[in-house]
Amino acid sequence: MRISWREFIKQYFSKPSKFHSIGIEMGDAELHLNVIQKKSGSYQWVKQHSLPMQDWVKHLQEYVTQNNLARTPCHVALGLNKYQLFQIDRPEVEEQEVAQAIQWQVKEQLTSTDEHVFDYYDHPAAIGGKEKVNVVAISRPQVTSIIKGISQADLKLSTITIEELATSELLAASDDAVLSLFQEKGGQINLNILKQGKLFFSRRLKGYENLASFSLQEFQMGMGDTLSVEIQRSMDYFESQLRQAPVRHIVVHLNTPIQAQLAELIKELTFMPVSIMDLPLTPNEPSPTVSLASLGAALTDIEINSEAGQ
């Protein structure tokens, strides 16, 4: 069989990536990435890295080339400041018309004059007898920039998600409700309540951006009480408004060197079992900080409770 050099080169450069996925978090100052590879039927967390957001496309191109990541499926997670999230009544229209109908309900609430792209995901429980949807609004220029940038870096863009959903991928599905407190370095605390793998409730807790600099004494003198009140309010809403069984467990992964002591303090103040989250995979390259949104994005299509740890 004869094959031209041009055809050979084309086939060579279209070979699939040896990596399973790459998760990218678009933060405020940095782009964080995690890479998953499947070897002998087991998923392995093989790389984690951070790049400056300034000229991020150039930096990402260089990293992809240096680490042979070309054509790897890529899942992008937007940091909390990159989008707006609204909860509204589900429009009473045909399924195919929902995406269009939601735009008119949230446009007046947008804080930016940019043209926006909208998407939504259904809320798993009715509130006050009404079905709800969570609407995500992202500026169109930002989406266009991401699509072009990922393509220029020679990655295969699979999904664009948000931090609340990406971090939800880190917890195995459970019939009991679990409240998670997750925080990226210098960010707000992201409070989620999950049940059976579904996100029932999400809040952003402000005022904890400098959590790493707070001492245990500062928490004991009042900050811990404030945080426990926010937790209790969220659990009360989950039970009373969403009519769900009580939360059974709290999981934390916070940006603080005293995380173990803080977890114990939360346990004492809420009278709830509290544990520090075990990451679903062990990194090949240990790092003092982990981008949870980036890791969760990389695990988007992996059942962590049954496959990832095998």
Across the structure, where does each feature detected by a protein language model lie?
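Hydrophobic/aromatic-enriched cytosolic interaction surfaces used to assemble or bind macromolecules
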Residues: M1-Q310
